[in-house]
Amino acid sequence: MIAGYFQLICTQSVEEFTAPVAGEYKLQCWGAGNSQKGGGYSYGDITLISSIKLYVCVGGQGKNHNGYKGGLGGYNGGGKGGDGSRINAFGNAHDYIGGSGGNGATHIGFHTGLLNKFESDYKTQLLLVAGGAGGFSQGNYGLGFGGGSEGGKPARIEIYDSSGTLMIPSQYGTSANQNSGYKFGEGQQGMTKSKHGNSGAEGSGGGGGGLYGGFSPQEEGDYTNWAGGGGSGYANSSLLTNAMTIAGDTNFPSPYGGMEKGHLDDDGACIVTQISF
C-alpha cells in the first residue's frame, strides 16, 4: 500500500476510517454499475485531524435475475428487480425473465449507517455520494446510469415491427436529482408482472441507490419492460473543497488506474489519498 493511500471495497458493511496523521485528504467514490450502465463518480478534498473518523459505505452491484425471480438490489440502496409474469397469452403457465436489481451507491459521512440514515442531517453529516446505476429488464438496458447531480432516467426502448418501422418511440421516466427521487438513499423496486404483455411480461429493473434513488415505473401490459433509473450523486461543497459529482455516462478516473466511461460491471469503490501534511 502506498503511504497515505487507502482503497476500500464493498464488504456489505459500513467501514470506519481514521486519518493516520493530520492533513488534507482527497476523497473519491464510485457507485456500483452493471455490464451496460455505469455508476457515477464523486470527489472532493477535506482537511482532517487524526481523531476525526469518517464512515465509508461502498455500494454493491445489483444481482441478475434467477429465472422469473427478479435480482436483489445492490447493497446501499439498490432496488430489487421485479419478477416476471408466470402466465402466457393463452393463460398457460410460462415463466418470463425477471428484472435485474438496481446498483448501490457509495457514500462517505461523519456518522455510521446506510445512506438512507442521513436524510435528516445530510447537509452537515454527508460528504460524498456516488450514485448507482439502475437495473435492466430483458432486452432493455435503458439510460439508467448513476449520478451525477442527476441520475439517468428510467427508460423503455423503441419498438419496431417486422418491417423495421418504428411503432412506439422510446419513453423516459423521471430522473432522480438533488432534491427528489424515489426515496432518499433508496431506489425503487422494479414492477413485478402478473400477466402477459408484448415486451411487457418480463420484470422491470430496480432503481439505483443515490442521494435520491432512481425510479422504476410501476406499469404492466404491452411494452412495459422498464429499465430502472440511476440514483443521483452528491458532493457537499460546504464541507469539501474542489468538490464535484459526475454522472456515469461520462469519462472519469477509474479506481484501478486510467479512465473509464461510467463505473461498469462492478461493485462501487472508495479511495482516500493524503495530498498534504
Model regions and ranges:
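A short catalytic or substrate-binding loop motif that flags glycine-/basic-rich loops and adjacent residues
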Residues: 8-11, 37, 99-101, 263-264
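Glycine-rich strand-loop-strand elements at beta-sheet edges
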Residues: 31-111, 135-165, 208, 213-243
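Chymotrypsin/trypsin-fold serine protease catalytic domain
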Residues: 105, 110-116, 121-194
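Extracellular low-complexity, Gly/Ser/Thr-rich intrinsically disordered linkers
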Residues: 186-277
